[in-house]
Amino acid sequence: MFRLEVENATGAALVLTGKEAQYQVINIEGLNPAPAQINTTPIANLDGALFNSSRLDVKNIVITIRINGDVERNRLRLYDYFPTKERVTIYYSNDTRDVFIEGYVENLECDLFNISELAQISVLCPDPYFQSIDELVTDISNTIALFHFPFAIDYDDPVPISEYEISRITNVYNEGSSETGVIIDILAKSDFSSITIQNVQTGDGLTLDYAFLTNDEIIINTNKGHKSVFLIRSGRSTNIFTAVRRDSVFFQLKAGDNLFGYVVNGDLQNEDVNIRFTRRTIYRGV
């Protein structure tokens, strides 16, 4: 069994499955991985070619729906939820995955003069990956729980219920099989002028040089097509992309383990920030 839902740019959502009295989903194309484009260069007097690069093409999702019940009214509803040229979000779930993908409605064709009216909807997705509904969160400083049952506390000899562990290296695990970006949320607990987040496996680092103040929040997005750096201070959001040091890398999370550390004002022992990594698992197909 599967569930299909669409959400238009205004946030209005329509569930298309389990409503056979109105809509019956006949077929969905594009749930498999998008085709790849392989770029090669022929080599004179040699068999084959030299590999240059590869990329995934735009994903084309085509949904075929039989319109039942009040056909006129239900067809017009589809026009509202699948407006051509506009952005839509398609939610799909089955027994193993619960994902969404964003795209733009290329076409919506209906056979108006057929007794059993069908609608065929084509959605082009510039980002060809499905994303998990659930976000995964990893903090770079963790709390160690020390509270166990049964227990007793001596008034003259108290014991800690929990304590903070300041981790210089944290594993941000990518459960998927494809690279993905990450959103890094930094909360300043004191003033500082420089912070570097570094992938200790690759050596890639992202450094911000700025006069940060206590209680500032810095949000870094490394997702392709959405790269940004914003500062939230006293409730006001400011674009501080110019604070990114020139040699910085907006790193991607490879499949599996990704080890990160940080340095504040060049001091490895500085503990005056809380850092959180938020990401989604991405899939080529469902």
Where are these regions (language model features)?
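Short amphipathic beta-strand/extended segments with alternating polar/hydrophobic composition
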Residues: 13-22, 99-106, 205-212, 240-245
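Intrinsically disordered, low-complexity segments enriched in serine, threonine, and glycine
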Residues: 138-286
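Polar/acidic, low-complexity leader/linker segments enriched in S/T/G and N/D
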Residues: 1-40
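"Short basic amphipathic alpha-helical interaction patches in structured regions
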Residues: 63, 74-82, 118-120, 135-140
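Short beta-strand and beta-hairpin "edge-sheet" elements
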Residues: 91-133
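Hydrophobic residues positioned within well-ordered beta-strands of beta-sheet architectures
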Residues: 61-63, 101, 119-121, 182, ...
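Oligomerization/assembly interface segments of phage tail-like spikes and tubes
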Residues: 46-69, 115-128, 258
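Short, acidic/charged, Gly/Pro-enriched secondary-structure junctions
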Residues: 66-108, 259-261
